[in-house]
């Protein structure tokens, strides 16, 4: 029979279960284990259990998708009816088997089990023969059946038959071997290896022997094979051990095998020596003798190995559970076992190498011809995505995840066993299952005697959790003798039931027994969560060095974690691929043919001293990996290892908690305990255990309750609800009384202790006073005082130590730059030469210029012409030369673009000026100021900007304000759609460029790795300058993306270019020589540099880079289009000296007014909260602060209260303004940092000493990098008394992130501004006594030297001068440590040993106090702009920046990171004239002589000249009324002066609704603006009406009005004359607006609208003949009175002899008169009204009057209606006179509604383009402007029509808009307003509404 025959069970994994509770039953599990042809099916395990696992020493044969069957012989299927393929048993979980597939059982099939007909399962695609189907009468649920035991004589519904021939015939031609370097799969060897070898098989069973086997013998064979399959040892026999001693240790991975000696283990199955073939050593194959097994090391014999008990629990399965299936195997009689008849027992060379987490479920067998497999096989890991643990833990999991079984039984202590089984190793046994000891046959056993196993042995290991079987205690298996010394069996059926207890009574007996057994045997093995396992194999350094000899590279990266040092191991393959986990290594080995390197040669443990070690360190350039030297590696490994736990003491170990057993199928629910007793009694034990106050009465009560529960369970009694409630109530009352008594006792004790402590405090104080009075008296009374003094001294030392520790902590933290006293001076930067503007204005200029360079092309600017330079912009803002025009043109274009997009805000969309929308008004230099003012008002800009523009134009504004306005427009344009689209395009190009750069970098990295491998040089040396700082992230991303591309080459189509490049690089690496690789690297380096520059240019093009700030808070900028680095001063961040003094005085008053009693209470609370704090910790992290301990951020509460004037508020942990101590003299540099070994502050005593050591090392490191801290620490040789104090030479300003003081010569100055939080270690201040002087803040402000420990504060830059406590009382500090108060609250604290604080802390404290003081920033550093043009200056700046400065640290980082780019920027050529100081004096003179009134006067005078020019133009065009001439020019007068018309009210032209409100300014005759207004008004009135057009003169809007002119007083008749005139609404608005003009821009708007309304083309000078198209012969040219067309009299048909008199109309006008109706042209001029009559117009030559070219303009017109002499407008106006009063009121109401705040949606008609769907919903739209036009035209005949239109407006609003919308709300408001006003005016007309 071949060795594979025994493998007929298939397992697909175990269900995930916690290691502490064992395996739980899974609903997806398959059939039972010992079913004929039924495999065990388990769901997939989690992380390291991929696929199959070894259960009971069995491994699987086929893949997880196939199932194994046991192919039985034909006679076995017909001789016994017990073979039922559908009968299943649970062998592992102590529960019943799962229901069979028989439909007669009415049970569901397992969800994950696919059965074939007959209950068979295919193995590798082969389906076995059909079994005999089970009948419905065979019940498969053992829980419902009778109990079955071995040898009980009871007929079993299930039997077991076994035939060795079946096993021999199962797999006749299959043999599995390991591929040496191939992928993790298996192949069938062409040469079979049955038994020990294919050529040697000395005891193959014959056919006749197997056919004549007795049924009992068959059972014995099957049981023996089962034991062989479940056995845990390798094949071990006397012959094998004698011939090859090295076979006595066949451990997996080289680990020591667990061997039970003869006196420690008794086999439960005794083999039959008569059939044994292991006695003959000749059966050993030659190959086995020559082939080393598993390890080439010398193997020790079994006798020399220490006995280690092997766990029988597999992933939490204990021994009792493993034998459950054997108990469930019913046999007819006593089994007679001939175990050695099974041929597999002698298969000594079959070893399963299947790892625990292998995903392939077929076993691997080692052929004698296959090479040895060392350690952990490459085939171990096939699942790479399931391992989520860390690398160091993964290695342990992979080597420890296989558990080993215990021996099934253990011998009695005093009875040596006589036989011991030689368990055969099944070919399916995994390495974890093949590590049990090989036993020997005792000489006492007769070689011909068989030793059947008594049945009590099997009963003794029956699972206790099975309800059908009695629970057998494990003690029976430990004490019951198995065989007699003579080897004869002694069956004792009664002995098997001596320790049986019902399973329902104690369900957890088996786990308890398992825990006891593990406690007794677990001392010699490594214990894990899943059971007892052997010690894992750790790869040796020699093995780990092997890959390094074949081109691999191993790196260990060490960095400081949150609590300790952490290490991470990386492997780099020969191709440069980085691997951080075992799955990556295994995949790499499987994909690449790597000789001599396998999985066991790798170790990811960072404690393995192999490879290169790197440590992450903080350098001036940032965090960097620094390679460690060989001397540093052992200390780092020790730091990584850390504190290892003490080995487990099993003698004192507590018993494991019993895991909860999950209820199986069919089991009744667990009885709930609260149902047996009342809830109060049931909860009482838990509550008492929680309170930990179990008294004797409570224990007795708990015992009584348990007894009652047991009695109720037995009797099944139940109480009535009434009795239960009464009983519960009584118990509850008793319990509550007891709890109250307990609480009272505890409270009384606490009060007593508190009173005692207070009395003790008072006593100590009293005694101290008495001691001070009587110093010379000594006696018994002084002893308590001495004790208290010692206590206080201990407390003072503790507080001093904590304070000093906090000071050391703060000395390491970044702090405000102006608080540091050891600065190096910054280099002097060059100020911008031609800069005249202020700092803020120049900042806005930079913004404007950079914006125009970036987006000017998008906005339509010509970058070469339209974009001004900084010099031109500065001159224009200063109104110098022609630059002003360029700035005004820039303003016009920017404002025009802003009005277009983004436009006005939504609430200002209807804003109009002179009836025109702002976006439609043509912008010019003259009127842009008024449009700009309206735009700023719409965006709610500050009123000062808008008010200044009311009376003064833009060019008269100050330069800083003009620059701010232009910057505002730029910021608004940044939100426009066109700019956003441009930014998106740029970002897309940046992303594409970055992707290309990553691809090139990936190729370059691979080539460098290959070159480094070939040349032997490290890869770091080959990196050029482009691989320096700031590239870690891109490199990492590139590696990750390249790894993804390798795994998904076929699917990833977007990275084809990257894959092509990678393949080309690999080809070059494999086939190219070193020169070729260098050429490729050089080529790719150039491409990388190109992409980096392009990326940098693209990314910098759209933004200005802020590099950071220095100690003076100056900002460093890099601009895309300007050369150099710009440095901007911080203006406005300083506080005036008067404010500082005022704040300081108020602070002093608050502190000094604090009552002493409040301070005493604060002291007691402080010291009491710190009484339990230990003095120090010698190792580990510092303890966390207790809730009562003082936090540094609470130390400045008093200052915060004074600053915010909220002394009653609690302190929040957010950053608050903080106080600084006064300036201290700066100390001179000292010569050294470290003290000698014998110094008072030597290391090793406390946390104070460790902190001092850490501080000194940090200082040394900092000085070594920057040499900036030479004066940071003082040594005893350079104490404060020996050094000369000198004031600091670097003056700085306090940081807004921290509280600072600006010291003066006489006291501290304070600056309160926004702060950044300061984190520090907790440091309670020393207690202060009441009777001793406590200078508090006065001490800090005095001139006393602050070199004592009590004057320091651990939180920088926080001053330890006040402390916020729950009471809100400030805590004062003592000035001297010797003057501290003494308090007894430190009783019980351990006394600090060692020397008192050394001078070191006093010196550090003195240095720290100097850091608490922020120096003021020099005024010359606060304002202005500098620039850096020299790269050498940049280098000097880098060296001068302080590494502890909170700002300069970040600045140093950015300057170092972008140093190359910044040097290029500094070397760019200059293109702006502002950097050339040629015209600087002229500009400065212009700034000094700047006067807004002069600029405004110049603008007003220019407007007056433009009005005069317009008058001349009208007269020259002959468009004026006949007889009017231009007045004398006023612009040449010398008496003109400037007069500003300040607005009396906030009235505004476009905001107040057609200008009907506000006062009219009084005009003066010597003001140019007033003269321009008056002359322009006269010009409008004297322009001929027929030469006007829209927008001022619309023909359909013309109305005729009358006015009464009274005669002068001197006239004899006091009569008045009535005149009539024509006017339009727009003309009226224009006139009102002109009256209220206060600026030149407003006048220009009115003048521009009038100019656009004049029909210049109708001028007489431009009239041509309709026939000949010529304009000559003016004396013969007739002008039409209707359209001003002309015609020569000789060209007219019929021909005229002379010019006719009167009106003449051309043919075009005559044809239009006939077709049009009179109603369509209501406002036609009088002279044309004759054409509107019903009779035809004829002009007889004799009757009609003629006129010449110089016709009289004032000739009367022919009346249209001779009968009444009234025109239709006059009649309509006459008919409306009766309703004049009503309509007047309507006009008033309409005017009020238009000026209402909520009327903005109804002022103008709704634009259907903007509001889609409005016309579909609203059929009759109406608005206020339409109502006004109708009202002015006389369209309303009654007030009811007006009211109907008003209500129509509101009804339309309610119909179209939601009520809760803005427009809907406005509609409701306006409706209520209209109704209220209408009711007031029309009390009696409510019915008309």
Curated annotation (Swiss-Prot):
Gene3D superfamilies xrefs: Bromodomain-like, Methyl-cpg-binding Protein 2, Chain A, Zinc/RING finger domain, C3HC4 (zinc finger)
Residue ranges flagged as DNA-binding region: 641-653, 662-674, 1176-1188, 1390-1402
SMART domains given in the database record: AT_hook, BROMO, DDT, MBD, PHD
Keywords from the UniProt entry: Acetylation, Bromodomain, Chromatin regulator, Coiled coil, DNA-binding, Isopeptide bond, Metal-binding, Nucleus, Phosphoprotein, Repeat, Repressor, RNA-binding, Transcription, Transcription regulation, Ubl conjugation, Zinc, Zinc-finger
Listed Basic residues bias regions: 661-670, 702-713, 1769-1778
PROSITE patterns listed in its UniProt record: BROMODOMAIN_1 (PS00633), BROMODOMAIN_2 (PS50014), DDT (PS50827), MBD (PS50982), ZF_PHD_2 (PS50016)
Residues of the MBD domain: 538-609
PHD-type Zn finger ranges: 1662-1712
Comp. bias regions, Polar residues: 35-59, 479-489, 498-509, 716-726, 1190-1231, 1269-1278, 1331-1346
Region (Required for TTF1 binding): 332-726
Region feature Disordered, mapped onto this chain: 1-59, 384-433, 479-526, 638-791, 1039-1063, 1147-1247, 1269-1397, 1720-1778
Subcellular location: Nucleus, Nucleolus
Regions annotated as coiled coil: 686-813
Domain (DDT) ranges: 839-904
Record PTM: Ubiquitinated. Deubiquitinated by USP21 leading to its stabilization.
GO BP term, pick one: chromatin remodeling
Modified residue annotations for Phosphothreonine: 499, 540, 1738
Domain comment in the entry: The bromo domain and the PHD-type zinc finger recognize and bind histone H4 acetylated on 'Lys-16' (H4K16ac). These 2 domains play a central role in the recruitment of chromatin silencing proteins such as DNMT1, DNMT3B and HDAC1.
Subunit structure: Component of the NoRC-1 ISWI chromatin remodeling complex at least composed of SMARCA1 and BAZ2A/TIP5, which regulates the spacing of histone octamers on the DNA template to facilitate access to DNA. Within the NoRC-1 ISWI chromatin remodeling complex interacts with SMARCA1; the interaction is direct. Component of the NoRC-5 ISWI chromatin remodeling complex (also called the NoRC nucleolar-remodeling complex), at least composed of SMARCA5/SNF2H and BAZ2A/TIP5, which regulates the spacing of histone octamers on the DNA template to facilitate access to DNA.
Family note: Belongs to the WAL family.
Protein name, per record: Bromodomain adjacent to zinc finger domain protein 2A
The gene coding this protein: Baz2a
């Amino acid at each position: 029979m071949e060795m594979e025959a025994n493998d007929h069970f298939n397992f697909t994994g175990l269900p995930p279960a916690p290691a502490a509770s064992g395996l739980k039953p899974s609903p997806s599990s398959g059939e039972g284990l010992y079913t004929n042809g039924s495999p065990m099916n388990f769901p997939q395990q989690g992380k390291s259990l991929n696929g199959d696992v070894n259960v009971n020493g069995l491994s699987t044969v086929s893949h997880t998708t196939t199932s194994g069957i046991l192919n039985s012989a034909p006679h076995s299927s017909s001789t016994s009816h017990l073979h039922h393929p559908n009968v299943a048993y649970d062998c592992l979980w102590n529960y019943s088997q799962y229901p069979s597939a028989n439909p007669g059982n009415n049970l569901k099939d397992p969800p994950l089990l696919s059965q074939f007909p007959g209950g068979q399962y295919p193995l590798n695609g082969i389906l076995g023969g059909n079994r005999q189907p089970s009948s419905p009468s065979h019940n498969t649920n053992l829980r419902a059946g009778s109990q079955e035991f071995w040898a009980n004589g009871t007929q079993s519904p299930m039997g077991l038959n076994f035939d060795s021939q079946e096993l021999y015939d199962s797999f006749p031609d299959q043999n599995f071997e390991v591929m040496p370097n191939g992928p993790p799969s298996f192949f069938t060897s062409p040469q079979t290896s049955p038994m020990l070898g294919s050529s040697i098989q000395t005891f193959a069973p014959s056919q006749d022997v197997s056919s004549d086997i007795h049924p009992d013998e068959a059972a014995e064979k099957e049981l023996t094979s089962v034991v062989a399959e479940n056995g845990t040892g390798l094949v071990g026999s006397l012959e094998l051990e004698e011939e090859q001693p090295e076979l006595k240790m066949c451990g997996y991975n080289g680990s020591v095998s667990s061997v039970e000696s003869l006196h420690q283990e008794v086999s439960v199955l005794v083999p039959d020596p008569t059939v044994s073939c292991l006695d003959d050593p000749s059966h050993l194959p030659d190959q086995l003798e020559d082939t080393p097994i598993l390890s080439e090391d010398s193997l020790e014999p079994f006798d020399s190995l220490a006995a280690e008990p092997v766990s029988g629990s597999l992933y939490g399965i204990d021994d009792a559970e493993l034998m459950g299936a054997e108990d469930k195997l019913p046999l007819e009689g006593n089994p007679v076992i001939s175990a050695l008849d099974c041929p597999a027992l002698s298969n000594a060379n079959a070893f399963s190498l299947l790892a625990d987490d292998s995903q392939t479920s077929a076993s691997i067998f080692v052929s004698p011809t296959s090479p040895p497999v060392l350690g952990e096989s490459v085939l171990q890991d096939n699942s790479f995505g399931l391992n989520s643990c860390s690398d160091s833990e993964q290695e342990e999991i992979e080597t420890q995840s296989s558990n080993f079984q215990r021996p099934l039984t253990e011998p009695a202590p005093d009875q040596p066993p006589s036989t011991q089984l030689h368990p055969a190793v099944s070919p399916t046994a995994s390495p974890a299952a093949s590590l049990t000891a090989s036993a020997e046959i005792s000489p006492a056993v007769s070689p011909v005697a068989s030793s059947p196993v008594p049945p009590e042995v099997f009963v003794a290991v029956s699972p206790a959790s099975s309800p059908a079987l009695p629970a057998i205690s494990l003690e029976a298996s430990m004490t019951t003798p198995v065989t007699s010394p003579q080897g004869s069996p002694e069956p004792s059926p009664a002995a098997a039931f001596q320790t049986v207890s019902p399973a329902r009574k104690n369900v957890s007996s088996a786990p308890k027994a398992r825990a006891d057994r593990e406690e007794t045997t677990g001392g010699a093995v490594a214990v894990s969560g899943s059971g007892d396992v052997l010690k894992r194999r750790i790869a040796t350094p020699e093995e780990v060095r092997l890959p390094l000899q074949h081109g691999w590279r191993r790196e260990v990266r060490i960095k400081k974690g949150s609590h300790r040092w952490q290490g991470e191991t990386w492997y780099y393959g020969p191709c440069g691929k980085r691997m951080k986990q075992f799955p990556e290594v295994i995949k790499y080995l499987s994909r690449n043919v790597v000789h001599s390197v396998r999985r066991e040669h790798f170790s990811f443990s960072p404690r393995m001293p192999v490879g290169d070690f790197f440590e992450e360190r903080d350098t001036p350039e940032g965090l960097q990996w620094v390679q460690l030297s060989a001397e540093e590696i052992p200390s780092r490994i020790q730091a990584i290892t850390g504190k290892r736990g003490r080995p487990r003491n099993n003698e004192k170990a507590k018993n494991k908690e019993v895991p909860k057993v999950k209820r199986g199928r069919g089991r009744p629910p667990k009885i709930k305990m609260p149902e047996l007793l009342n809830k109060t009694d049931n909860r009482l034990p838990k509550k008492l255990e929680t309170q930990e106050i179990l008294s004797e009465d409570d224990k007795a009560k708990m015992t009584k309750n348990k007894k009652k529960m047991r009695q109720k369970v037995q009797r099944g009694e139940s109480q009535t609800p009434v009795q239960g409630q009464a009983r519960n109530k009584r118990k509850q009352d008793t319990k509550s009384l007891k709890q109250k008594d307990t609480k009272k006792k505890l409270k009384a004790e606490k009060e007593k202790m508190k009173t005692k402590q207070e009395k003790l405090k008072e006593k100590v104080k009293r005694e101290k006073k008495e001691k001070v009075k009587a110093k010379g008296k000594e006696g018994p009374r002084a002893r308590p005082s001495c004790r208290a003094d010692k206590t206080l001294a201990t407390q003072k030392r503790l507080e001093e130590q904590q304070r000093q520790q906090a000071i050391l902590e703060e000395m390491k933290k970044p702090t405000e730059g102006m608080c540091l006293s050891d600065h190096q001076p910054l280099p002097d930067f060059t100020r911008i030469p031609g800069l005249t503007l202020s700092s803020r204005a120049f900042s806005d200029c930079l913004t404007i210029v950079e914006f125009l360079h970036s987006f000017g092309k998008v906005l339509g600017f010509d970058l070469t012409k339209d974009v001004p330079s900084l010099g031109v912009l500065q001159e224009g803002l200063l109104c110098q030369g022609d630059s002003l025009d360029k700035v005004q043109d820039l303003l016009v274009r920017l404002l025009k673009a802003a009005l277009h997009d983004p436009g006005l805000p939504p609430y200002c969309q209807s804003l109009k000026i002179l009836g025109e929308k702002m976006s439609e008004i043509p912008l010019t230099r003259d009127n842009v100021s008024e449009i700009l003012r309206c735009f700023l008002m719409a965006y709610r800009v500050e009123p000062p900007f808008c008010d200044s523009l009311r009376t003064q134009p833009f060019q008269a504004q100050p330069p800083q304000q003009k620059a701010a306005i232009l910057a505002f427009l730029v910021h608004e344009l940044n939100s426009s759609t066109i700019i956003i689209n441009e930014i998106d395009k740029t970002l897309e190009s940046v992303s594409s460029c970055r992707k290309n750069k990553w691809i090139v970098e990936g190729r370059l990295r691979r080539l460098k790795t290959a070159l480094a491998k070939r040349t032997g040089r490290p890869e770091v040396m080959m990196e050029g300058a482009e691989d320096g700082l700031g590239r870690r992230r891109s490199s990492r991303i590139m590696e990750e993306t390249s790894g993804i591309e390798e795994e998904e080459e076929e699917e990833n189509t977007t990275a084809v270019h990257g894959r092509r490049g990678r393949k080309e690089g690999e080809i070059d690496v494999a086939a190219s020589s070193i020169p070729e690789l260098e050429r490729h690297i050089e080529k790719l380096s150039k491409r990388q540099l190109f992409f980096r520059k392009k990326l940098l240019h693209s990314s910098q093009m759209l933004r200005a880079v802020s590099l950071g700030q220095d100690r003076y808070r100056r900002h460093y900028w890099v601009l895309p289009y300007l050369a150099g680095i710009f440095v901007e001063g911080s203006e406005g961040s300083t506080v005036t000296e008067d404010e500082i003094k005022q704040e300081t005085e108020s602070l002093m008053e608050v502190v000094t007014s604090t009552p002493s009693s409040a301070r005493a209470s604060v002291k007691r609370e402080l010291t009491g909260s710190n009484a339990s704090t230990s003095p120090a910790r010698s190792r580990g992290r510092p303890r966390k602060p207790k809730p009562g301990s003082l936090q540094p951020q609470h130390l400045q509460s008093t200052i915060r209260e004074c600053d915010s004037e909220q002394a009653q508020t609690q302190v929040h942990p957010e950053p608050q303004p903080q106080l600084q101590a006064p300036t201290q003299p700066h100390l001179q540099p000292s010569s050294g940092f470290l003290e000698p070994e014998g110094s008072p502050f030597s290391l090793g005593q406390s946390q104070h000493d460790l902190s001092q050591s850490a501080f000194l090392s940090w200082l040394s490191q900092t000085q070594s990098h920057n040499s900036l801290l030479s004066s940071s620490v003082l040594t005893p040789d350079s104490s404060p008394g020996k050094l000369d104090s000198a004031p600091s030479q670097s003056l700085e300003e306090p940081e807004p992130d921290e509280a600072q003081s600006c010291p003066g010569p006489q006291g501290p100055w304070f600056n309160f501004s926004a702060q950044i939080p300061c984190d520090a270690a907790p440091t309670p201040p020393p207690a202060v006594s009441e009777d001793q002087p406590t200078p508090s803040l006065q001490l800090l402000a005095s001139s006393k030297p602050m070199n004592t420990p009590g004057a320091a504060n651990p939180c920088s830059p926080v001053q330890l001068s006040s402390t916020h406590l729950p009471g809100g009382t400030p805590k004062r500090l003592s000035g001297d440590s010797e003057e501290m108060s003494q308090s007894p609250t430190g009783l019980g604290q351990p006394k600090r040993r060692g020397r008192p604080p050394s001078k070191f802390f006093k010196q550090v404290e003195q240095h720290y106090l100097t850091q608490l003081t922020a120096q003021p920033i020099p005024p010359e550093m606060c304002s202005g702009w500098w620039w850096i043009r020299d790269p050498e200056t940049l280098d000097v700046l880098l060296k001068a920046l302080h590494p502890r400065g909170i700002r300069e640290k970040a600045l140093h980082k950015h300057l170092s990171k972008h140093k190359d780019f910044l040097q290029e920027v500094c070397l760019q050529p200059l293109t702006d004239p502002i950097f050339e100081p040629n015209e600087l004096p002229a500009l400065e003179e212009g700034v000094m002589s700047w006067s807004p009134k002069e600029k405004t006067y110049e603008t007003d005078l220019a407007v007056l000249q433009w009005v005069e020019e317009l008058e001349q133009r009208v007269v020259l065009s002959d468009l004026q009324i006949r007889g009017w001439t231009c007045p004398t020019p006023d612009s040449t007068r010398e008496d003109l002066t400037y007069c500003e018309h300040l607005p009396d009210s906030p009235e505004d032209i476009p905001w107040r609704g057609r200008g009907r409100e506000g006062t009219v300014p009084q005009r003066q005759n010597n003001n140019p603006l007033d003269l321009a207004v008056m002359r322009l008004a006269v010009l409008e009135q004297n322009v001929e009406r027929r030469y006007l057009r829209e927008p001022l003169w619309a023909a359909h809007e013309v109305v005729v009005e009358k006015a009464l002119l009274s005669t002068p007083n001197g006239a004899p008749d006091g009569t008045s004359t009535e005149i009539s005139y024509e006017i339009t609404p727009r003309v009226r608005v224009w006139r009102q607006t002109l009256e209220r003009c206060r600026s030149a821009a407003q006048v220009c708007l009115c003048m521009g609208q009038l100019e656009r309304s004049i029909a210049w083309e109708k001028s007489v000078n431009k009239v041509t003949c309709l026939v000949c198209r010529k304009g000559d012969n003016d004396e013969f040219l007739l002008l039409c009175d209707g359209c001003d067309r002309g015609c020569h009299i000789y060209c007219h048909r019929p021909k005229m002899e002379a010019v006719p008199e009167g009106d003449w109309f051309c043919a075009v006008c005559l044809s239009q008169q006939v077709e049009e109706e009179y109603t369509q042209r209501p406002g036609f001029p009088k002279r044309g009204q004759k054409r509107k009559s019903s009779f035809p117009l004829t002009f007889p030559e004799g009757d009609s009057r003629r006129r010449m070219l110089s016709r009289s303009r004032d000739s009367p017109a022919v009346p249209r209606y001779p009968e009444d002499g009234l025109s239709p407008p006059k009649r309509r106006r006459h008919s409306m006179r009766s309703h004049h009063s009503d309509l007047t009121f309507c006009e008033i109401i309409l005017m009020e509604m238009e000026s209402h705040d909520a009327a903005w949606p109804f002022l103008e008609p709704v634009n259907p383009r903007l509001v889609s769907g409005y016309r579909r919903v609203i059929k009759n739209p109406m608005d206020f402007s339409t109502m006004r036009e109708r009202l002015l035209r006389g369209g309303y005949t009654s007030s009811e029509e007006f009211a109907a239109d008003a209500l129509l407006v509101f009804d339309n609003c309610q119909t179209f808009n939601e009520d809760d919308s803005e427009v809907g709300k406005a509609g409701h408001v306006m409706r209520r307003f209209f109704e209220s006003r209408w009711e007031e005016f029309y009390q009696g007309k409510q019915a008309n509404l």
